[in-house]
Each structure stands twice: as C-alpha cells, then as structure tokens.
C-alpha cells in the first residue's frame, strides 16, 4: 500500500497501487505521482517562489489496459502472449518462455509430450507419435507434415508488454557443408497500453548430412492488436516458405544398420539421381474485430466490461493461399544388396525406379497444386451477467468458406491454363461457457454444415475443469469430449499428377474422443488418458507391391484407440529426473499404426555457478519407442503412408548437453546422438527408410533485450 497526499487538501488516501486506481485518480484530477507531492516551485535569489510558467499544452492521460480479455493477474505481467480465436470473441493466453526449461530442444517436433517421428533433420516433416496429437487437416493436407513449423491464424502470436521486447536466437551444428542452422528473431512493442504490434521470423533448415536432403523452412508472422475497453481488433499476415530436397530414404536399411559408410553423405538414397524437390508457398491475411454494447450503465468504477452484462458483435475474415510444386527427373538407383547368389553373397541390382507410373511426361515431373480459401464469419457473444459467471458467455455465429482448387488436367493443353474448381461451404456454430469462482471451468460447443460443400459435417465438444487446493498446491482435473463427422479432403478424392492419378468417392469419417487428465503443476505431475473410436478412417496405404504404390484407402469399419500418458519430474536437490511415458493400443495396426511404448527421459543437474547471475544445467536427453510398422513417407504426395514391410524402433536416441542462463542470455552446448556406435542396435530410424541424424555437435545462444 502507498499513501498519496492530494495537492490542496489534507486528505490522505490509502489504496492499492494498480492501474485501476491510478486511472480513476487521473479522471478526478488528483495527483498520481508515485512518490507523493511533486517538486515545489523553484525560488528566486531572494527566496521568493517563482510563478510556474503557463503552458497551453496539457499532458494527455494515457489509459491503462482495460480489455475484458485479460484478468488482473495477466495485466500485472511485464510481458504476455496470446492467440486469437477464429470463431469466437475469445483469446487464449500462451506462456512466454525465457527460462531454461526446454530451450535446448531445438527441434520443434520434439517439444510436446513424447515428440514426433521425424523424417530426419531440422526443417523436415514429422508425424506425432501420440495419435491424439496428429493434425486433422481438411485444407491443404500436403503441408501437415510441417505442422510444428507453420504459422497460421490459430497460432500467430500477439504480445502486450510494458517495455519493448526483442529476442534473438541462433543455433548451428556440424561442418559448414552439412550444417543445420536455426535463426529466430522476435520483436514486440506497445504503441499504447492497449495497442501493440509484433514480428516473429524463423528460419530453420539443414544443408543435409545425407545426400540430397537440403531443407529451408522459413516462417514469418506480423501481427497488430488493439484490445480496448469496447472495441478490439486483431490483424495479421503470415508467410510460410519451405524448400526440401527429397532423397526418398535409403536404398536399404543395411546402409545404416551395418555402418558400412564412414560418412553419412555416402549412404545411398533412392531419389538422389532423380533430383526430386518440393517447394511449398503460403500467404495468409486475417482480420477479426468485435465491438461491445453494454447492457448496464458504465460508471467510472467499472474498470472493464468483464463484470457487466454486455453483447459483443464481431466479424472475422481470413484469406489463405497454399501451393506445392513437386519436380523430378527420371533416375534410377542401385541396391548393392539387392539379391544373393548361390553362395549366399550379396549381388548388386541396378535400374531400380522409385515411381512406377509417369502419366504426363516420361522423363520429368513438374506438378503444381494450389488451394485458396476465403473465410468469412459473423458472430455474436452474449455476456448475461459477468464474464466469469456460472454462465459467462453464450456465443453464436454463421459463416461461409469459398475454396478454390487448381491442378493440371489433360484438357489444359487446349486452354493453356489450369482449370479451377470452386466450392462453397456454409456453416453455423455456437458455444456456452462459464466458471464457478476459481474452482470450476466449463464449456460446450457445436458446429454444423447444413448445405453446400461439406454439407452434413458436424462437430460437438464439451470441456470440464475442476480445480482444488491441497496445502496451497493446485490440483486440476479435466475432462473433454468430442464427436466429429468430417468430409474427406478435396485432394484425397481428386488428384492428377505425373506419378499419381485418382478420382475417389469416399464416405465421411466419424470420430469420437474422450480425454481425462489430472495435473499438479507445483509437483510437475501429469496423468492423461484418451479413448477414441474412428469409423470409415481415411489413410494413405499400399495399393500394390513396392513403396511407391501408394493410394488413398478407407477402412470400412471401426478402429479403437487407447492412450495413457504420464509425466513426472522428480527433483532431489539440484538433480532433475524428468520422465514422460506414453502407452498406446490400436485395434487395427494396419489402419492406425502406433508404438506400444514411447518415452522421453531427461536427467540433468541444475545449480548456480554465481548466485542470481549464472545458472547451469548438465545432463542428457533420451528418446525411445518400441518396434512397430512405422509410417513411410512419399515425397510426391507429401504424405505419411501405412506400410507393412519394415519395423522401426527399439533404439535409444540420446543427447548430452550443457545449458546455462546468464542474466538475459541463454546458451547451450550439445552433442546429439552421443550413443551412436556405443550402444543400441544401429537401427536409428523413426520413419521407415528415413534414418535419423548421426552424431553432431551443436551450440546455440538466445538473448533478450528490453527498451
């Protein structure tokens, strides 16, 4: 508390020092100097007080952040980050991490849960090991392998800070010829307490330890937000540009398992001579805004509209364009162990072709696929009593999406241009949410497509969170339910390219999920369980012999999935034993393959080198999953597909690291895959035929600047 003495009065008011009190004091014309009475008027040589110089320019009072989106505890933070909802008048607060927690994990596909199964290196695609974390993209699914890199409206970051914030990160590894690089820069600044802008740029990629595996993955998000007392607007521009050389994986697992090649660049790959390459381009613009209409008289005591009855009217628009260009030339590869002679010796077989079909041109491919989406939403949100009430908000909205698809067809030889297919989908949605103090948080939602493209699609969802306290420690029990009926993606039914052609008629998928979790954050404990049932599952799988004979398949029946997840970080003094374990069961591994056990273990010792100045962590990270028929990856389709030829797993992938935080700077030194050649069976694959990186040294630095 402070004692603020008012000028010209003997009153003394004791009050809490917060934005709400200061604003009201300013409105009443009171002195808001945090240090009491301002300096007295200066005296002349005779000791007489001089008259202050009259000024016609009055200092403008700066309004504090009054938005109903943020609670008092969030406003008190020096910097915070959030994402905006596409459908509703809501935001989702996200952590702004500047600690040592997991900064050493430079591959984004390894940061959540037990991580993903990656194709290989930084910038390349991956698929989550946990089935319930896998992306379910109806729009341009070709980009889904890069889900952990891509910016879009759902994850474009907005910031609010009391001081300008700049953070730079640089990580590199390996020799210059094979180097992986990760450069990130983030700048966020407030124009006023309610208005801010930010720029996030990330460039991640590799020159490739293996032959023909160079990758560039660049992502940028530029956002502007104004979160006023009544009017709010969020706008952003997103660009994703990805270039990948596609080597098609090793000619045989023996090339990795038997360690014949001293350098990974000598490992023979199947598409090296074909010079296969994918280029993905994406531009997206979005704007969502809302205006509040209070249903009660707003007084000076009402700091925000969160505690009043109100109606909010809003509109959201998004334009998103994706394209993918796949190129290659006719090329063959040689398998040095393609067969055996009568004496049991390996015999090389030449002339292997990765693709069996060349529908358009016999010597070269250039397949370009493009998808555009214009989305409009008009929504209303009612706040019957207050935003944190038992019934806090009731939402409803309508919208339509205009989808435009273009690809080459034989008829385009006559017209000289690609034919475009346009489809329009109409939908309506609604939700209701509420709270009971800090102990109960609940919501339910529904979305339906009554007609048009995707007509008949529907989704239902519900969420309940119960929060209690034991000796001051929060205990959180959550449950979720969802049921979704969704149409197949356009490209799953329609594709014409040099290597693949199909015109399918697929039924809608129907999936039901139930999730329960229990968390004790102060003790780093988390338990979770998922149960799912999928009917008419659509997937990529084999339609003939060989890896390239892949097509879209649909399972006529139900598949049941069960997942159990446990996370516990044990701490004994400075020793940390962080454990994450996932168990999964699938009733049909040919349709939805999952490993029985997946684990991420991180054991390290943390200590102060110089108290409150330099803190270090020294330890190791390990990843493991049991053997299963892991998915393969098809470059022309940019898709993971099910296969039953090669089992992958039973290999521990271990890194050793030293990480430190010195004031605002974070640094780390790491040797990745330190156990290569020391222990393990040598099968360091995570995706069929795609080996993980062999050992390499990495170093990184991240520095935050303020003001």
Give, region by region, the residue ranges found by the protein language model.
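Membrane-proximal, glycine/serine-rich, low-complexity loop/turn segments characteristic
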Residues: 17-283, 292-306, 469, 473, ...
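Single conserved hydrophobic/aromatic residue that forms the stacking wall/gate
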Residues: 1-15
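Glycine-centered flexibility sites
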Residues: 5-8, 208, 700
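Exposed, low-structure sequence patches enriched in small/polar residues
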Residues: 13, 135-136, 161-163, 272-335, ...
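Residue-level signal for the start and early helices of compact helical domains
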Residues: 2, 156-159, 186, 431, ...
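Low-complexity, intrinsically disordered/propeptide-like segments
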Residues: 9-11, 20, 25-26, 37, ...
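Short Gly/charged-rich anion-binding patches and loops
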Residues: 1, 219, 653
